[in-house]
Amino acid sequence: MNSPIAVIGGTGRVGRLVTRRLLDRGEAVRVVGRSAERGRELPEQAQFFLGDVREPETLRIPLRGCSAIIYTVEPGTDPAGPDSPESTVHTGVRNALAAAWGGAVPPQFVLVSQRYVTRRDHPMNAYGRMLDWRLAGEDAVRMSGLPYTVVRPSWLTDLEEDSRITLEQGDRRDGYVSRRDVAEACVQALYCPSARGVTFEMRSEPGSGPADWEPLFARLRTDEPAREAGARQLLAPVADRAIA
């Protein structure tokens, strides 16, 4: 790509893998994170910016002029804590979307969410309403007007083996997927036209990985068009608030 790619949460477990894959492709990468110490552990080719998704003013400079943004922030589970699901995967997403509109050309936005977000009775929702807030963050992305991809991984593992990847929709099944494969999906979404405007779940099984991701994305249904009314309102930086 001709412009930098920002990885928000790029010092986290998935974010670091995304960063390395982009660098391997020769991309200019801006990593946004809260820990200067962890930032020093990044490859020297990556440009680190100290930023916090809960503080909109810290996002404007690192996101300015980026051709794409990959949001890999990992939430906490305490609803009253500083890394609550609300503040990281809803408010933080909205703040990043608002900052993303600062350039002349709207960037592509890739959001790492999770499977089960439409199942409010799933046990994961007991942790600070994790699933409710993730779904609200997804909705903000879909309503933003930016070109986007929403990735919903299954249970995450650290396996390094090559895997057969399944992309699916409907949020009905279960499964596992490695962080390695999630990172690859995020990166591939930037280069595959069929990945635009889709939300999908992913899981992996023993087998060979895809040689070409475009056919996998091409089998997915695009999301219903977002309503224009109210879309811009969703782009304003926000303080935490409750979901009705």
Predicted regions mapped to residue ranges:
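N-terminal Rossmann NAD(P)H-binding glycine-rich loop of SDR-like oxidoreductase domains
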Residues: 3-27
